[in-house]
Amino acid sequence: MRLNSVALLSLVATALAAKAPFKIDFEVRRGESKDDLSPEDDSNPRFVKRDGSLDMTLTNKQTFYMATLKIGSNEDENRVLEDTGSSDLWVMSHDLKCVSAPISKRNERSFGHGTGVKLNERELMQKRKNLYQPSRTIETDEEKEASEKIHNKLFGFGSIYSTVYITEGPGAYSTFSPLVGTEGGSGGSGGSNTCRSYGSFNTENSDTFKKNNTNDFEIQYADDTSAIGIWGYDDVTISNVTVKDLSFAIANETSSDVGVLGIGLPGLEVTTQLRYTYQNLPLKLKADGIIAKSLYSLYLNTADAKAGSILFGAIDHAKYQGDLVTVKMMRTYSQISYPVRIQVPVLKIDVESSSGSTTNILSGTTGVVLDTGSTLSYVFSDTLQSLGKALNGQYSNSVGAYVVNCNLADSSRTVDIEFGGNKTIKVPISDLVLQASKSTCILGVMQQSSSSSYMLFGDNILRSAYIVYDLDDYEVSLAQVSYTNKESIEVIGASGITNSSGSGTTSSSGTSTSTSTRHSAGSIISNPVYGLLLSLLISYYVLV
């Protein structure tokens, strides 16, 4: 049987659509919170100085990565914050109620140690029941009354991270100990909060929206901002790819100003407190056959860039140098047999001196959470002291950070971080120096709380690496980044990464591999089905 050209073209198109790379270009925005995002043309990290050049309070201007979604048959446009440290998508309802965070909380956005999401006693008790009494679903009156008593007794507050989930995974709080790290406040600036300035979704105008008959959606942050609403599912278009029946939440009341696209592990979905998980965006992309594996690669770009990208189901070999090295994510909780957050082992950290020698500031395996939602990085006290000493910095109690020589902003020295798998990422010290005033510079590495079991690397470290997140196999692959606008993209099959060699350099990108097929200018696609169908199509045209 002979196929005509139209049929063959249709097969080619179908093959490409089924397993083609799915790329989201995001814009970089800065702000103290999601209520205080920077103007469109301002993507540089910002800090607020008060009360003198040294005796000052610095307000962390966080980093946000914003993507555009079109939701429902009405294609309501929403700009949301991409977050690798949370796992739920939620957007604003068209008629939601905008509320303000308490003034006392808004005034505490500093470098103080935040605990992330604040859970009340009722929620803490529920998490213990989920772990040890999975069949029990009814709360006692005593448990309900307990929520009135806890407030901030167990958990402090602060707005140093931008991850915004309410759950830490099943059993996370079985010992009622505060866990400090990836999570943080969402914002809430007061009466000027319009809530819908970055878009909203009108469920009544979408013919394809279905409301879930489940518990309400609820997220609460350490700075007392929150969002509550309903769960549902609808068609969501991202970068010209439509995901059918994607589960997400619609907020009816919030003190935040923008929704969130969480793409983390399913163990961090807010529904885990109700003993179930669902297919968030990475998992749904795989389930629908849009990508072959729940995997994405992240390119944060340079410190002053206004845009970056995330590539689902594929790797851009032009964006890194050398080889990708894969490390297993670490288990977060002893009670859980799998990781619930993206945490990897770091073996050692060295600081390069001006003479070329190195000073070791960390040795021995230490868990580190990779959180692109955090502008700054947070390490343990002894590591921070060693880093400050190596850079001849002076610790300022009033600032809560090391004051360093501003000449380091132009330094070519690096901090060398060896991850598990013997992969070393070189981080320019200049990326870790923040200008607080004309004559004062701050080290953008802060002290992690002593109650935390892990350190945290934010985007000032992570932008030096090209990182591939494999949610199926709980793996992370890393390589030294190569900053370039060129692309050499390979689709990843169900078996995972097969080609781990980068074609990028510090000045230019490389070329394609011999097994790749040219798909479009500047893009390399490795897809056997596409190659076979394209060969059939070429043969057909030759024969006729």
UniProtKB/Swiss-Prot annotation:
Pepstatin A binds at residues 83-85, 371-375. Keywords: Aspartyl protease, Cell membrane, Cell wall, Disulfide bond, Glycoprotein, GPI-anchor, Hydrolase, Lipoprotein, Membrane, Protease, Secreted, Signal, Virulence, Zymogen. Residues 1-17 form the signal peptide. InterPro entries: Aspartic_peptidase_A1 (IPR001461), Aspartic_peptidase_AS (IPR001969), PEPTIDASE_A1 (IPR033121), Peptidase_aspartic_dom_sf (IPR021109), SAP-like (IPR033876). Optimum pH is 5.5 using casein-resorufin as substrate, and 6.0-7.0, the pH of the saliva, for cleavage of Hst 5. Its EC number is 3.4.23.24. CDD domains: SAP_like. It is found in: Cell membrane; Secreted, Cell wall. The active site is at 167, 371. Induction: Induced by fluconazole. Expression is regulated by growth phase, temperature, and white-opaque switch. It is a lipid-anchor; GPI-anchor. It holds the Pfam family Asp. Monomer. This is Secreted aspartic protease 9. It comes from Candida albicans (Yeast). The gene is SAP9.
